[in-house]
Amino acid sequence: MAKIISYDEEARQGMLEGLDKLANTVKVTLGPKGRNVVLDKTYGAPTITNDGVSIAKEIDLEDPYERIGAELVKEVAKKTDDVAGDGTTTATVLAQSLVHEGLKNVVAGSNPIALRRGIEKATEVIVKELVAAAKDVETKDQIAATATISAADPEVGEKIAEALDKVGQDGVVTVEDNNRFGLDLDFTEGMRFDKGYIAPYFVTNADDQTAVLEDPYILLTSGKVSSQQDIVHVAELVMKTGKPLLIIAEDVDGEALPTLILNNIRGTFKSCAVKAPGFGDRRKAMLQDMAILTGAQVVSDELGLKLESVDTSVLGHAKKVIVSKDETTIVQGAGSKEDIDARVAQIRAEIENTDSDYDREKLQERLAKLAGGVAVIKVGAATEVEAKERKHRIEDAVRNAKAAIEEGLLPGGGVALVQAAAKAEKAEAVTSLTGEEATGAAIVFRAIEAPIKQIAENAGVSGDVVINTVRSLPDGEGFNAATDTYEDLLAAGVTDPVKVTRSALQNAASIAGLFLTTEAVVANKPEPKPAAPAAGADMGY
């Protein structure tokens, strides 16, 4: 495909117009009195939302230079959303403000590289001030307050607080569709995985078609269980104890399966066979998780263990196991707390080190099954459009609440940024800057007022008046746009997670630095649209 190239001011101006088109669309949603944006769809009903990243994703501009500018800001919104689940609009507004302030200086002849260094240094100091000002989340009400602000719905805030209170920080909260109107909250006790019984003959409870094993032994093997002698040895060991047996294996087939089923039907020996979840290395890891949870050892050729020669020491134990057609739940495994804690620490380290979003999600699920639990918020609404929009807001609010637990809370409404910047301006790392680096730092201190101004203007109040008033207030006090009052925002429940505010500023500063140091843009040349056929052409005359 042919390319078009522009340089210097022309390049930056084209990108700036694209950035402004996207940012001006997104920023009307900021704050408690922010407006909605309607997104037209190629098929189906339009979507109505006030979620910054959803709006940004839908914007695709025709002009190639404008498209590149818009894509840069989309990256800010997406990165902030991925890390913290909220703050996308704040990040977009900050990026726009930083770029505008920076370009004024670039046009006036400042060195973009020096400006970028100044922006980075000022951002680093402000982030330190934000972290220092953080307040730990101590109550369920604080979680509810921050989730309520993110989702703009008190009922959602309460459900998320209840879910996280139950499953803990390491637990997983998933959001699913509900067949009926409203919100429902379900909890999973113990470790649950999505594999059910291999054959319905293992069912013990005909009413709900489940196999319930009380105080069972648990055999975990990474291979197939096929021959009769594979199973007879283990079955005889367990039969002597009078307890049931759960077998989790790659598969149970051949002579082994009918042997188990026949003994089950006769009442000679109660058991249930389940396929191991996952594939490949992930299956091995999940089997090892189960082994640690239940105090078992995985029987595998790699370890030199054979089914025909094992004893009860390799079998795990649990208080109860419930197996349905589609899933298995292990309740109160008998593994040692020390081993479980060590495994949890190992999975946490893997989460920190992975670059793959998919791997991180799967590791988080494993962590939840070992350390916390799983809560499911079921969402129902009058229309499919409303349900989809509400579901998305709840997913964001869950990540927002987890971010608050992880790094703490700050006063919301853009106030924390302004107050942290006021302290950062006096820090030696900033006052020691000279020349154009000092100019770069000054750009950050001016641009950082943009979110609070936008929140005020969306609420119908002068942004400049609000900024001047907030500067004179003690730390933690600011403008509550929901009530049009100045008050202690932490006490009023108007809070933002540190992670959200920090990520928004860092991502905005990163993109602004790239924008200012751009000297050329290479874009795809738009393909000419084919001309419409002349009237009367190809009519057979």
Swiss-Prot record:
CDD domains: GroEL (cd03344). Pfam families: Cpn60_TCP1 (PF00118). One of its GO terms (molecular function) is unfolded protein binding. Gene3D superfamilies: GroEL (3.50.7.10), GroEL-like equatorial domain (1.10.560.10), TCP-1-like chaperonin intermediate domain (3.30.260.10). It is an enzyme of class 5 (isomerase). The keyword Transmembrane helix does not apply. Its EC number is 5.6.1.7. GO terms for cellular component: cytoplasm. Its main location: cytoplasm. Keywords: ATP-binding, Chaperone, Cytoplasm, Isomerase, Nucleotide-binding. It catalyses: ATP + H2O + a folded polypeptide = ADP + phosphate + an unfolded polypeptide. ATP binds at residues 29-32, 86-90, 413, 480-482, 496. GO terms for biological process: protein refolding. It comes from the Bacteria. It is found in: Cytoplasm. Together with its co-chaperonin GroES, plays an essential role in assisting protein folding. The GroEL-GroES system forms a nano-cage that allows encapsulation of the non-native substrate proteins and provides a physical environment optimized to promote and accelerate protein folding. Forms a cylinder of 14 subunits composed of two heptameric rings stacked back-to-back. Interacts with the co-chaperonin GroES. Belongs to the chaperonin (HSP60) family. This is Chaperonin GroEL. It comes from Bifidobacterium longum subsp. infantis (strain ATCC 15697 / DSM 20088 / JCM 1222 / NCTC 11817 / S12).
